[in-house]
């Protein structure tokens, strides 16, 4: 204040240049003011942001969201039904065929092993006729 008394052309001190309103308040009061400003929730802030768009844009965005939600629900229901139909059809139509082929292969493997045991090890490889004599070793 002494500088103000010295005259209008006198240089000001650093204390006089700083703003006095916030400098006198303690930090706790400043934090409380910030907390008071942040009391609104995220949904309130988002709702407040919608007011900056015209009603026509908001209604179009809402209709688009509703339509996309409806389509997503329909696609989900359809995919569930299609998956159920595909899975049950596979189990009824394809699995019995797979099991029978596996059973047939196992029976053929057992017959081949029995033939090897009864007729010798080369019989299974040459695929000779049943009841025929085994081939002589060393001759093809």
UniProtKB/Swiss-Prot annotation:
Spans annotated as Disordered: 1-40
A single GO BP: protein targeting to mitochondrion
Chain segments carrying region TMD: 81-101
Ranges in the topological domain labelled Cytoplasmic: 1-81
Mitochondrial intermembrane side: 102-140
Chain segments carrying region Import sequence: 39-48
Acidic residues composition bias: residue spans: 25-40
Pfam families per UniProt: Tom22 (PF04281)
Localization per record: Mitochondrion outer membrane
Composition bias, Low complexity: 1-11
Entry-annotated residues carrying Phosphothreonine: 41
Residues carrying Phosphoserine: 13, 43
Stretch list, region C-tail signal: 121-140
Keyword Transmembrane: yes
Keyword Signal assigned: no
Membrane topology classification: Single-pass membrane protein
Positions of transmembrane segments: 82-101
Top-rank lineage group of the source organism: Eukaryota
GO MF annotation list: mitochondrion targeting sequence binding
Keywords linked to the UniProt accession: Membrane, Mitochondrion, Mitochondrion outer membrane, Phosphoprotein, Protein transport, Receptor, Translocation, Transmembrane, Transmembrane helix, Transport
Subunit structure as annotated in this protein's UniProt entry: Forms part of the preprotein translocase complex of the outer mitochondrial membrane (TOM complex) which consists of at least 7 different proteins (TOMM5, TOMM6, TOMM7, TOMM20, TOMM22, TOMM40 and TOMM70). Interacts with PPP2R2B and TOMM40.
Primary role: Central receptor component of the translocase of the outer membrane of mitochondria (TOM complex) responsible for the recognition and translocation of cytosolically synthesized mitochondrial preproteins. Together with the peripheral receptor TOM20 functions as the transit peptide receptor and facilitates the movement of preproteins into the translocation pore. Required for the translocation across the mitochondrial outer membrane of cytochrome P450 monooxygenases.
PANTHER family: MITOCHONDRIAL IMPORT RECEPTOR SUBUNIT TOM22, MITOCHONDRIAL IMPORT RECEPTOR SUBUNIT TOM22 HOMOLOG
Notes on the domains: The N-terminal domain (residues 1-60) is important for binding to the unfolded mature imported proteins. Residues (47-69) of the cytoplasmic domain interacts with TOMM20 while the C-terminal segment (residues 61-80) binds presequence of preproteins. Requires the transmembrane domain (TMD), a short segment (the import sequence) in the cytoplasmic domain localizing separately from the TMD and the C-tail signal in the C-terminal domain for efficient targeting and integration into the TOM complex.
Family according to the record: Belongs to the Tom22 family.
Protein name, UniProt field: Mitochondrial import receptor subunit TOM22 homolog
Originating gene: TOMM22
